[in-house]
């Protein structure tokens, strides 16, 4: 039962690029076969150099995002510096592990840029944590997205190329996964900028 909730109803993507990271999601939120929202927020800014995506329970994901935002701000005030992406992912891993008997039904990507370079970590509901070296996808549309990512990913690609690849993978997932759709949202994190923006899907997806 937990596994069903864990992977239900979304597609999220993370891509390591030459100068930063790209996170991407579609906008649909579902309750079973019912489309509950067509503009769901699935990317959350944690710090000026880190963000997270959620797949699974929206409420659980929002709560975890708020916890991380507060903890990261407290760290900044006490230590006069930002938490590393590794530290953020370890903190979230510990939070999830402590709740393993009443778990958050959510799968999370944490991505960003720090002194160690661009980093993306994926975390499961029980606190399992993996550092991704190239790209990652979560949610019900991820098996379809992975086909595009594996075929077209190139080491050292720019964030602009990463956005285009993520868009292509999301659109492929939307064509086949009924729980994914209704537009795309992207987060680009580099040393120069933190940007969250939206993009409409192509006509081919709308007419599919």
From Swiss-Prot:
Q: How is its activity regulated?
A: The formation of the proteasomal ATPase PAN-20S proteasome complex, via the docking of the C-termini of PAN into the intersubunit pockets in the alpha-rings, triggers opening of the gate for substrate entry. Interconversion between the open-gate and close-gate conformations leads to a dynamic regulation of the 20S proteasome proteolysis activity.
Which top EC class applies here? hydrolase
Q: Name one GO biological process term.
A: proteasomal protein catabolic process
- Which residues are responsible for catalysis? 10
* Intracellular or extracellular location(s): Cytoplasm
Instruction: List GO terms (cellular component aspect).
Output: cytoplasm; proteasome core complex, beta-subunit complex
**Reaction catalyzed:** Cleavage of peptide bonds with very broad specificity
> Quaternary form?
The 20S proteasome core is composed of 14 alpha and 14 beta subunits that assemble into four stacked heptameric rings, resulting in a barrel-shaped structure. The two inner rings, each composed of seven catalytic beta subunits, are sandwiched by two outer rings, each composed of seven alpha subunits. The catalytic chamber with the active sites is on the inside of the barrel. Has a gated structure, the ends of the cylinder being occluded by the N-termini of the alpha-subunits. Is capped at one or both ends by the proteasome regulatory ATPase, PAN.
Propeptide stretches in the record: 1-9
List the gene name.
Answer: psmB
Q: What's one Pfam family here? A: Proteasome
Q: What does this protein do?
A: Component of the proteasome core, a large protease complex with broad specificity involved in protein degradation.
Q: Which GO terms describe its molecular function?
A: threonine-type endopeptidase activity
Which PROSITE patterns does the record associate with it?
PROTEASOME_BETA_1, PROTEASOME_BETA_2
- The name of this protein is Proteasome subunit beta
**Entry keyword annotation includes Heme:** no
Q: What is its EC number?
A: 3.4.25.1
Q: Give the family, as the similarity comment puts it.
A: Belongs to the peptidase T1B family.
User: Which InterPro entries would you find in this protein's record?
Assistant: Ntn_hydrolases_N, Pept_T1A_Psome_bsu_arc, Pept_T1A_subB, Proteasome_bsu_CS, Proteasome_sua/b, Proteasome_suB-type
Checking NCBIfam families in the record gives: arc_protsome_B
The superkingdom of the source organism is Archaea
Q: Which CDD domains match?
A: proteasome_beta_archeal (cd03764)
Q: Which HAMAP family match?
A: Proteasome_B_A
Question: Keywords assigned by UniProt?
Answer: Autocatalytic cleavage, Cytoplasm, Hydrolase, Protease, Proteasome, Threonine protease, Zymogen
